[in-house]
Curated annotation (Swiss-Prot):
Function, in words: Binds together with bS18 to 16S ribosomal RNA.
Protein name: Small ribosomal subunit protein bS6
Matching InterPro entries: Ribosomal_bS6, Ribosomal_bS6_sf, Ribosomal_S6_plastid/chlpt, Transl_elong_EF1B/ribsomal_bS6
Entry annotated with the keyword RNA-binding: yes
Organism from which the protein derives: Parasynechococcus marenigrum (strain WH8102)
Entry keyword set: Ribonucleoprotein, Ribosomal protein, RNA-binding, rRNA-binding
GO biological process, one term: translation
Length: 127
């Protein structure tokens, strides 16, 4: 059984950019992958953390992890945009072999639970 590979891209944003701009970067890179034909599996903001060593005179950075599948063409488009952005101070994309990560369950999300309950209600009504 061959499992399809997927990609994990971790990038670090400058710590001094405002929260609205961080959100715009999250949506910009996610939309860029979707337009290039990739499926975005997960997009997690890891928050502001201290760097192991200074990068461009920054001691902290905002970490973001993006899991997606597709071919290498989407990765090239994404990395080119990150390389040209002044707000991204580091990025790394790793090709993962193995099972896809389970989707995150966001607390308080009702739409995911609703479809599971409906078939049970329909089967009870039919009996």
């Amino acid at each position: 059984m061959t499992l399809d590979p997927y990609y994990e891209t971790m990038y670090i944003l400058r710590p001094d950019i405002p929260e609205e701009e961080v959100e715009s970067h999250l949506t910009k890179y996610r939309d860029m992958l979707v337009e290039a034909g990739a499926d975005v599996l997960d997009n997690q903001m890891r928050g502001k953390r201290r760097l192991a060593y200074p990068i461009d005179k920054h001691k902290e950075g905002i970490y973001v992890q993006l899991s997606h599948n597709g071919d290498g063409q989407q990765v090239a488009v994404l990395e080119k945009a990150m390389r040209l952005s002044e707000d991204v101070i580091r990025y790394l994309t790793v090709k993962q072999e193995g099972p896809l990560p389970a989707p995150r369950v966001v607390p308080g999300s009702e739409p995911a639970a609703a479809p599971q309950e409906q078939p049970a209600a329909n089967s009870e009504a039919a009996s």
